[in-house]
Amino acid sequence: MEEKIINKIMTGSHDLNKWLEGGYEKDIITLFYGPAASGKSNFIMLAACHEAKKDKKVIFIDTEGSFSIDRINQITGGIPEFVLKNIIILKPTNYQEQKEAFFKLLNELKSENIGLIVVDSITMLYRLELADARAKGIEEVRRVNFDLAKQMKALYETARKREIPVLITSQVYNEFLSEEDWLSGKQPGVEMVGGDLLRYWSKCIIELQNKNGKKKAIIRKHRSLPEKEFNFEIVNEGIRRRGLF
C-alpha cells in the first residue's frame, strides 16, 4: 500500500481517492472526457488545488476559460491566495498559442517543484483548427494531427521522466449513424475528440457522464484497475460519492 501512495497524488476528494485506490498515478497522462457539465473541470481543479496547497507548483493550460477563482475559493474554504500563487496559468486562445504554451511549459519544468500539469481542454482549439484544415485539404489535416501528437508526446515524456502527473480533458461528439441504423432506432454513441491519438498516449482514461443531472465516472482504461463506475455529485468542497437516491 505504501508504494501506491508514493507513486500517486491525491485527487482532493476522499471518495475519489478510494475509488482510484490512492489517487492519480504520477508517471502517466490521465484523460477525462465527457459532455459539457459532466464535471471534467471540477476533477482537475480539485487536484490542482490539492497540489498547490502542498506548496507545489501547478501548470494550468486553460483553453476553455474554465479556470475560476470563485471555484478555487469554494474548494479551499476561502483561502485562495496561497493556492493561487502556486498555479501558473497559461490561456491560449488559438491553436498556435496552444503550441506556444507547450514551449513555455517545458521552460517552467526547469523548476524542481512542479507537482502537476493540467490541460483543460487539449482538444477545444484543436477541434477548431481541424475544421479549418479540412477545408484546405489532407495535408493541412495531417499537420494539425501531427501538432497534437507532438503535444501529447511532450506531456507523456514529462510524466514518465520527471514523474509529474498530467491531467487533461477532451470534449465529445455523437457518432455518425448510417441511414439504416437511424431508421432502426439505434442511438448514437459518444466519441471522444482526438480519438485514438489521445487513447494511445493516455494510460488512464475516465469517461464522465451526466444523465438527467446524475453524474457518473467510468474507468475506461487503467494499468491496474478494472473498468468500474463512480456515481458522484459536485459540492462546494469538491466531489463526493452520490448515494443511491
Residue ranges of model-derived segments:
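Amphipathic alpha-helical transducer elements in NTP-driven molecular machines
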Residues: 10-13, 17, 26, 69, ...
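P-loop NTPase motor core
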Residues: 104-197
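Short, flexible loop segments at the rims of nucleotide/cofactor-binding pockets, characterized by
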Residues: 7-8, 36-37, 95, 144, ...
